[in-house]
């Protein structure tokens, strides 16, 4: 089993910025699916993780009800990681969010989450096929 575990140095990392119990469910599912996941409990923590961690492959945001300006957070993080894919989880699309950021409705299935993540992490998808 250890041989199939990806190297943390080369594996794209996922940073999740969320403030509620959804964070635990999403983090758990992604970790059980073999992803390297780092939790950020608020926008400042997400900024810090994205500054400090190498090889970030995806940012997942759910800032509903926090007062966080999600589009500004995405733009700020993309100053350092200009091509970073982002997945927004929420009840609806957010005005001003960059056009390339899809929204996954909060009432999603585990399969919908994994398909969304796989679609945004093409390097991992390619590695799975090899």
Segments and roles (model prediction):
Residues 15, 38, 85-87:
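A structural signal for isolated positions on well-ordered beta-strands in alpha/beta enzyme cores
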Residues 17-19, 42, 89-91:
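Cofactor-binding loop segments of dinucleotide-utilizing enzymes, especially the Rossmann-like FAD-
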Residues 39, 65-68, 107:
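Residue-level signal for the "D+5" position in two-component response regulator receiver
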Residues 45, 66, 92-96:
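Negatively charged, flexible loop motifs adjacent to catalytic sites
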């Amino acid at each position: 089993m250890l041989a199939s575990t990806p190297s943390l140095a080369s594996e794209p990392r996922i940073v999740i910025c969320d403030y509620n119990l959804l964070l635990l469910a999403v983090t758990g599912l992604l970790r059980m699916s073999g992803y390297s996941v780092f939790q950020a409990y608020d926008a400042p923590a997400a900024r810090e993780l994205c500054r400090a961690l190498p090889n970030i492959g995806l940012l997942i945001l759910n800032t509903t009800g926090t007062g966080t300006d999600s589009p500004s957070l995405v733009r700020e993080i993309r100053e350092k990681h200009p091509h970073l894919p982002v997945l927004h989880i929420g009840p609806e699309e957010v005005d001003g969010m960059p056009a390339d950021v899809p929204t996954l409705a909060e009432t999603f299935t585990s399969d919908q989450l994994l398909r969304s993540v796989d679609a945004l992490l093409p390097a991992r998808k390619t590695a799975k096929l090899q």
